[in-house]
Amino acid sequence: MLGLFNNSNSINGSGNNQDIDEIKREQMSNFDQFEDGLNNNNSNNNNNNNNSNNNNSNNNENINRKTGSTLLSSSTSQLNSSSGQISFSKDAVAPTKKRRYIVDKDHIFSWTPYCKAYWNKLINVYGVELEPPQLNVSAEKGFSFSEVDNSWIYYRRNHFQLGIGVSHCFQFLESSPPLISLNGSIYPVDDFYLCIRGVKNGPDVNINEEVEVELYQTNSKREKGEEKLPPPVLMTFSTNVTIPRLHFRKATANNARKHKLPNPQQEFFRLVLTVVARAQSRDFCITSMISDPLIVRTGHPTCNPVSNNPSTPGTPISNFDSSNNNNSSSSSSIINNNNNGISGYSPHTTVTTNSTTIIPTYGSGNNNNNNNNNNNNSSGNSSSTSPMVGPLGVVFPPSPINSLSNHNSPHLTPIQYNNNNNNSNNNSNNNNNNNNNNNNSNNNNNNSNNNNHQFQSNNRIFKGNLSNPFDLNYSQNSNNNNNNNNNNNNNNNNNNNNNNNNNNNNNNNNNNNNNNNNNNNNNNNNNNNIFSHNNNNNNNNNNNNNNNNNNNNNNNNNNNNNNNNNNNSQNIHFYNNNSNNNNNNNSSSSNNNNNNNNNNNNNNNKNNNNNGNNSQINEKHNLSSNSNSSGFTAELFSSIENTIRNNNFLTQKPHFPFDQTLHQLQFQAQNNQYDQINGKLDNIHNNSNNNSSNNNNSNNNSSNNNSNNNNNNNGSHTASVKRKLSNSYDQQNLEIESPQSYISSPTPYFVDNKQPQPQPQPQPQPQPQPQPQSQSQSQSQSQSQSQSQSQSQSQPIQQIVQQQLSSPTQFSQSEEVILSSPLQQQTIQSIQQQQPQQQVITNPLLQQPQQQQQNIISIGDMDKNIKWAQSPNGGLFHFGNVGVNSENPQEALSVNGNVSISGMMYQPSDKRVKENVKPVNSKDQLSNIMKLKIYDYQLTDEWVKSQNLTETKDRGVLAQDLNTPSNHIPNSVKHTGDRILGNGRVIKDFLVVNKDAIFLENVGATQELSKKVDNVCMELETLDKKKFEMLGHKMSELERTTIREIKKNQKRKKIFIGIGVFTLFVIFGLVAVSIVLGTRNTITKNITVYTTGSPGYLNGDCTDSESGSNSCYDSSSNSAIDTTTSTGSGSIK
């Protein structure tokens, strides 16, 4: 088939002697060859672009074979070529291998969001809204597009299948599952499910007109008896979901066309995909999508209007915007020129070959592939029939014969690729482009959305009281020169590693090589975070090879002062991991000016601005790269512990709490006292916290060691406490920058209205200041000085601790003491546990007797010893009973008056703190509730006035009724002792009622009633069953009786009929017998009639004799009348 279209001499119209069967066999064999050789050649096209000459020739061969078979199968009668004609009948069309997935050229079966108003939001444990799983739907088979109807067609007797790719935007953890917000309540999500249904709607989506239609799923055998509704599919951890063998049971209405045009009253079906979150055994919609309208037909029409390119496309659907993919490869540019304006869609089907599979992208556009494959070295042997290589090696053949295709090149749907690994293949093999370093400039947005799920998307600044619960704002900012996590991989030496190799080979040059490239590289302005993790890696390798004489090498690393200015204004927990590797290798010759070269050693210590840079943060943890995190804080508290133990501070009860003393010591030591001893401890901690390699042969130690603390309060707005440098540390030296300091600082502080009496304090010894050494001193002296500083670092700490122990201070309500870090708190707890309970004070600084001070708060006319403190969570606490409008609180909180609560009241009820747990008999609870009486009452005036009540009428129970043995509810009544009213009246043994106990008793009674109601319902159901059974029995008996009676009546009827018939026969027989007998025996009677003048009877001549009666004489005629009587005849003479 290679020569079928390329070589004009292989087949020449009617002159061809090749048999049709051979052509068919060749076509089928070429299919297998094409399947085997397609992917290997495609992989060579994408990867080995410089050696693409041979691969292009092989691809041309395979593609031309495929083109021949494809075009031959689509032809019906004739093929026109440049050399001749080829005539085939319809029976001679070569069979084409059925492909399951076909890429559509023109049409897109799209899905759009549906019913957004009914979507529920997903949030995490920090209250940040999460994106729901994104779906990429691929209608893999069953649908085809109709040009006439301008709609998608589905035939009811077929089945269709949906392949859904799921892209999870967050990780589902069973330990901390996502939460769903429902009417202000939050529930954990158990699993995610995918549901599908069919709806009836018009061409435009209208939710109000939605009617659900029957959509069924069959088994693999497609048995009608096994049809069922598509069940929900579990998709919690799935990335690919397939819903097979779906079909509509009914066709759409008004499918008939009018005048060969679409019916304006055409009915449409649509598919609806819904992602539900299952929580509390209920399903809640989190996202939903609806498909394009479908026309469901019963059978294929005679003239099929469906296009020749059935498609099963799908677009990536998400309720969140997704960024566009930047495919900058040479093959994609070809495809983009043939899109006819269609762009931004993902593949609609999955193209499967023997070794390569194109999987649709299920992401939200987080990955940007910048494949800079410059294929300018390929040979020019490719002809007009050379195949087009698509993305990922998919080859799409061109159409060499214009009469066989509608377009000269296929119109392919742009394909979006799944690149979760962010692989940027920068194969710049372009000999025509010498700027190879600039080929990586397209990689600016790699990994740009890898951290989409940071916990700071809300960016809410906490401004309320920390005693109230709030959502933590967690952020993990890894700013390795990445603004908004954009890795600018510009290979133009603009990285953090500023390797400034200044090779100065000239004489008398003033090389002021200031490394200004790192000034603002790592300024992490986390103004709204509560937890902040800042990892700043600044590697400044300054290799200044000065090989000439008289060079003034002022290579001052002044830029390091601003490298790590982490302006964390409202951070509560700050973890600062700063690693400043400043390798200053100054190899200068013998003629260099030592005065200028020695400045580099002192500038290395300027990297210590990380130690005190965030002194206003409440809890600071400086973690160095070598895991040496103790630093000054550990040494300070170690000295505090040793001083306290040596002075036997815990011998007796101090004049104020021990924790408060330690808080004051920590506070003063962490502020300006830290500044006083910072000069001596500076060089020591530089070596532990900053990897500074000072390879310098000079000995100049200037006084720039303390310059690193200039940025301690840079850009910080957190309220903090400052102390003035003075010899006495009393209350008057405290200053508060902001009156709202307690808002941003959840550290404990103590309330005290009365200022203590200032005690005479010993003056602290002046701290020795380090003096700069001369330039002529040797390097060994510099090293010995650093060792002496290391040995004497605890001396100023001991002085500070002793000074603080001798000058205890109290704090007022408007002042604030910053608590220590968790490390410091552990140190304090260990000191308290290890100290003996009874010792003797041996500290000479504490020998002076001091009067114990009390924290006094005025409440009405009484003064009570009340000590309030603030917990690390920001709440105030106090040990003892508290009364509101009550001078003598009997409980932890006694309130005289109304209490308004906007939230919920909770009580501890954990099973692990309870013993002897026994169930309560609900029958007894019901009996107690039945005995309980509710009253309407009015409070007395004296009680209302004494308790500051506003309502005098109420409804409730009487404590005396509950205190009787017959009606005893456990823990419902409490005796509170005598109560004195405002008028002096004393109520003996005042009783109060626990309504919670009554409520629980009512719950038990309700349960018992519920049981009884259930029993009654069960009995009623039993009675109903019995009634129905009895009625059934009666009905059946009546039916049987009726049937028996009917049968009896039928028998009687038959008997009566028989008897009647027999009677008739008897009657007729008797009549016949009588007739027969009557004809044989005739009875004759002679009647004589006499005719006289007057009848015998009338004349009186006739007698009463028989003869007289049988004969009469007619007097007129004197004639006798004879009468003969016989049966049936008579005669008269």
Curated annotation (Swiss-Prot):
Alphabetical UniProt keywords: DNA-binding, Membrane, Transmembrane, Transmembrane helix
Domain Peptidase S74: 909-1020
BP-aspect Gene Ontology terms: positive regulation of DNA-templated transcription; protein autoprocessing
Positions of transmembrane segments: 1055-1075
Cellular localisation: Membrane
Membrane topology: Single-pass membrane protein
GO molecular function: DNA-binding transcription factor activity; sequence-specific DNA binding
This protein's record includes keyword Glycoprotein: no
Pfam families documented for this protein: MYRF_ICA, NDT80_PhoG, Peptidase_S74
PANTHER family: MYELIN REGULATORY FACTOR HOMOLOG 1, PTHR13029
Protein name: Uncharacterized protein DDB_G0292186
Organism field: Dictyostelium discoideum
Lineage, uppermost ranks: Eukaryota, Amoebozoa, Evosea, Eumycetozoa, Dictyostelia
